[in-house]
Amino acid sequence: MSTPALLVLADGSVFHGTSIGYEGSTSGEVVFNTSMTGYQEILTDPSYCKQIVTLTYPHIGNTGTNAEDEESRSVYAAGLIIRDLPLLHSNFRASESLHDYLVRNKTVAIADIDTRRLTTLLREKGAQGGAILTGADATIEKAQELIAAFGSMVGKDLAKEVSCTETYEWTEGEWALGKGFVTPDEQPYHVVAYDFGVKTNILRMLASRGCRLTVVPAQTSAQDVLALNPDGVFLSNGPGDPEPCTYAIEAVQKLMESGKPIFGICLGHQLISLAIGAKTLKMRFSHHGANHPVQDLDSGKVVITSQNHGFAVDADTLPANARITHKSLFDNTLQGIELTDKPVFCFQGHPEASPGPQDVGYLFDKFIGNMKAAKRA
């Protein structure tokens, strides 16, 4: 017999459905993601910490789960909302059903609700707090208490919550059919990567391009990073509000003074922007999906990108030495900048995809080019 589940939003909206995961309760910011596939990568993306993810594609779980598609060491999404969980899963790589995976990772999830109605509501009113409760004793009143306790994503420094606690080395490259994860024979570039919630495919794409990575915790000082003598510094994606991450902003400012090539993605993009004096703002309509068109202003090309952020950089606050390189064609929000006087650039979306297209994978090549030029100088 199925277990009932309840989804309640901060605006008072109520959805009744079925529990498909761990029995219990959870709260967070409710967002929607338009990706058709990649649910396991989404669940394990640390950028979804404290967020309950609604997947707009109706059938989720068809291909099961496997150990190779993990983007971090655990599930970070606060909860999952879907329309329908198939009775069977089928894929040659599958080792576990989505239901069993959710239970094992203690992830609360709800199905059999009208996700079209929910998505429309979130699109019109914006992302908001919500709670999922399972079991016959779940009540709207209890959900409202959880929502009130959660509050808002504004002001939440989550990067240091999801970051590694110890420095570690990474050399593993991208996955290949029949070979698994391949480590390149030569890795001539040493990159220090800040872990603000880094996805493993970012590390793999850098490693496949010849980078030996030293991954450091979010609160590592610039002095400690420079002592490692890197060829370049990478600033990762991550969850939460970038403004409270003052430790990271100060470190980025000092690293930029060193002249080292720096590349930032997602939260890393926002931290670079804050470090040069720009401002960030909470988006009413956050970007979550694998089909977002972005224009590369240098080439004029339109690239399809994977996106996952609820904060954005205010383009009107950029200093004179910051050149805009990319913009969203959905809402014209800032997607990328490059400094004109330092080898520093960043991108709001996710070039590594996982899930999604890798149209902007060339940004990793640009970072390699900057390090190569710096080594020749």
Swiss-Prot record:
Keyword Ribonucleoprotein appears in the UniProt entry: no
Pathway stated in the Swiss-Prot or TrEMBL entry: Amino-acid biosynthesis; L-arginine biosynthesis; carbamoyl phosphate from bicarbonate: step 1/1; Pyrimidine metabolism; UMP biosynthesis via de novo pathway; (S)-dihydroorotate from bicarbonate: step 1/3
Region (CPSase): 1-186
Annotated ranges, domain Glutamine amidotransferase type-1: 190-377
Keywords, in A-Z order: Amino-acid biosynthesis, Arginine biosynthesis, ATP-binding, Glutamine amidotransferase, Ligase, Nucleotide-binding, Pyrimidine biosynthesis
GO molecular function: ATP binding; carbamoyl-phosphate synthase (glutamine-hydrolyzing) activity; glutaminase activity
Biological process (GO), any one: L-arginine biosynthetic process
Residues the record lists as binding L-glutamine: S47, G238, G240, L267, Q270, N308, G310, F311
EC number, UniProt record: 6.3.5.5
One Pfam family matching this protein: CPSase_sm_chain
Keyword check for DNA-binding: no
Subunit structure: Composed of two chains; the small (or glutamine) chain promotes the hydrolysis of glutamine to ammonia, which is used by the large (or ammonia) chain to synthesize carbamoyl phosphate. Tetramer of heterodimers (alpha,beta)4.
Protein name in UniProt: Carbamoyl phosphate synthase small chain
Organism listed in the record: Neisseria meningitidis serogroup A / serotype 4A (strain DSM 15465 / Z2491)
Gene symbol of the encoding locus: carA
